[in-house]
Amino acid sequence: MISLFKKLYFTFSRSSRIIITLVIIDQLTKWWFINNLRWKPGLMLKVTSILNMVYTWNYGISFGLMREYYQYSNAIFLITNMIIVCYLYHLMICSKTIGSFVGYNFVIGGAIGNLIDRFCRGAVFDFIHFHYRNYSFPVFNLADCFITLGVIILIEDYFSTKKVIEETSKENFDNLQIEAMAAKIRNTDHVSNDKI
């Protein structure tokens, strides 16, 4: 029982530092853009030929989806996001690899960053806008980057872990076959010796 508490404390303290750092980075960048640039919604700052900084409030979910239901759904978004964060935290505590631990931390940190916006401001502040020729990617923020990076880490971890498990299983299966053949040979030798 004590070892379980030690594991939970160790996991909580490590993950808390990562998550809090990501949330602080996200909230500081949003605060800086909102307060120092004194933009108005719709204005844009061209950074490069493919990157703009824009002032946008996202009243929907990721990438502005479902924003037309904002009046009815902000409370639902908040509750749903809190439930998802709690579930992801549970998965992170149960994670067996460093990759999944880090991936869940990034997803949780990004989700909490956006959750703070929705709770304190009623919407999520987005400011990063990539575009190329006629293609325009939806406006996003650093919390969205953290979530995306976390999902990529989790996917990579899943496939690399799956590969290791498959290789280990095949190796174990091959070893079992060799042991079975050796036992069969020993039994055959034993029977042959009995006949002599």
Curated annotation (Swiss-Prot):
Its EC number is 3.4.23.36. PROSITE patterns: SPASE_II (PS00855). The chain crosses the membrane at residues 43-63, 75-95, 97-117, 135-155. Pfam families: Peptidase_A8. The keyword Ubl conjugation does not apply. One of its GO terms (biological process) is proteolysis. It is a multi-pass membrane protein. It comes from the Bacteria. GO terms for molecular function: aspartic-type endopeptidase activity. Pathway: Protein modification; lipoprotein biosynthesis (signal peptide cleavage). It is an enzyme of class 3 (hydrolase). It is found in: Cell inner membrane. InterPro entries: Peptidase_A8 (IPR001872). The keyword Cell inner membrane applies. One of its GO terms (cellular component) is plasma membrane. Keywords: Aspartyl protease, Cell inner membrane, Cell membrane, Hydrolase, Membrane, Protease, Transmembrane, Transmembrane helix. The active site is at D126, D144. NCBIfam families: lspA (TIGR00077). Belongs to the peptidase A8 family. HAMAP family: LspA. This is Lipoprotein signal peptidase. It comes from Rickettsia typhi (strain ATCC VR-144 / Wilmington).
